[in-house]
Amino acid sequence: ASDVYKRQKPKIVVIGSCNTDMVVKAGRLPVPGETVLGGTFYMNPGGKGANQAIAAARLGAEVTLISKIGYDLFGLQALEIYRSEKINTEFIFTDQKSPSGVALISVDSYGENSIIVAPGASRSLSTEDIDKAKSKLEEADIILMQLEVPIETVEYAATIAKSYGKKVILNPAPASVLSNSFLSCVHTILPNRIEAEMLSGIKVIDEESAWRAAKAIGEKGIENVVITLGKD
């Protein structure tokens, strides 16, 4: 029975960023030029790609993460964490010239945060790296992507995935201008209201405008459009 279960595990490839989140909690966030004495400090794996990969692996999928790290302590620690989460790290490449990505996050007592991301090696994930992982794209059931790695790399991977008849799920964040040729390779897209407005040209202010924006985005050749509205 266990063999049957293993065969039924969905194979998911995630193409995206991996960062180390460095988080400090404080009573309030500092204003420019101010120093605030904080409380708790901790480090977590972060980056939209790594977050998706960890979540999918914990839900029982067979996950491969395609990403890039620097040859440094943060990168090596990230690899250990991904392996402990049963993620295939075979295609996490190392950039000898760039540091691993980090995010500096300050959080106040209400949960409001301010974040600065230094993407580092994530920004050098290339089309050549995707070529090295083509066999995994061909085996995959689903390919997850976001836009914290170069858009030309993601678009190249989406084109290959479509040629293999694979379902591409795109989280179009950070908000960016995307070509119709790229969007036509996407099966499911998950924009927030700002990203939906950028993709559709329709300002999303309520449920009715969200429906209109979703319809306009769907007309670009995307089968499923899911617009997230935050706390609404």
Where are these regions (language model features)?
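Active-site-proximal loop->helix
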Residues: 73-85, 103-107, 111, 129
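Alpha-helical segments flanking ligand/cofactor-binding loops in enzyme cores
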Residues: 54, 79-80, 155, 159, ...
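Conserved phosphate-binding/catalytic loop of the ribokinase/pfkB sugar-kinase fold
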Residues: 90-95, 105-142, 147
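Beta-strand->loop->alpha-helix junctions that form or flank phosphate-binding loops
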Residues: 15, 40, 66-71, 89-100, ...
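Short, small-residue-biased leader/transition segments that mark boundaries at the very start
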Residues: 1-5
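Conserved phosphate/ATP/ADP-binding segment of small-molecule kinases
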Residues: 158-232
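Short gly/ser/thr-rich secondary-structure transition/capping motifs
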Residues: 86, 123-128, 168-175
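Glycine-rich phosphate/adenosyl-contacting loop at the front of the ribokinase-like
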Residues: 6-68, 73-87
